[in-house]
Amino acid sequence: MAKA
């Protein structure tokens, strides 16, 4: 999961 990518987190900004």
UniProtKB/Swiss-Prot annotation:
What does the record note about the cofactor? Binds 2 [2Fe-2S] clusters.
Q: Keywords assigned by UniProt? A: 2Fe-2S, Iron, Iron-sulfur, Metal-binding, Oxidoreductase
User: Any signal peptide, and if so, which residues?
Assistant: none
A GO term, aspect molecular function? metal ion binding
Domain of life here? Bacteria
EC number(s) from the headed UniProt entry: 1.2.5.3
Catalysed transformations (reactions): CO + a quinone + H2O = a quinol + CO2
Q: Does the keyword Metal-binding apply?
A: yes
Its job? Catalyzes the oxidation of carbon monoxide to carbon dioxide.
What assembly does the database describe for this protein? Heterotrimer consisting of a large, a medium and a small subunit.
Protein name stated in the entry: Carbon monoxide dehydrogenase small chain
Species, as recorded: Pseudomonas carboxydohydrogena (Seliberia carboxydohydrogena)
